[in-house]
């Protein structure tokens, strides 16, 4: 679960380009 949540956060971060 932790890894999946991390991937989701990275994906949303890249989509919003606010890393």
From Swiss-Prot:
Annotated compartments: Secreted
Tissue-wise expression: Expressed by the skin glands.
InterPro entries on file: Antimicrobial_frog_2
Keywords: Amphibian defense peptide, Antibiotic, Antimicrobial, Disulfide bond, Secreted
Cystine pairings recorded for this chain: 13-19
Main localization, broad class: secreted
GO cellular component: extracellular region
Family: Belongs to the frog skin active peptide (FSAP) family. Brevinin subfamily.
Biological role stated in the UniProt entry: Stimulates insulin release by BRIN-BD11 cells in vitro. Has antibacterial activity.
The protein, known as: Rugosin A-like peptide
Source organism (scientific name): Pelophylax saharicus (Sahara frog)
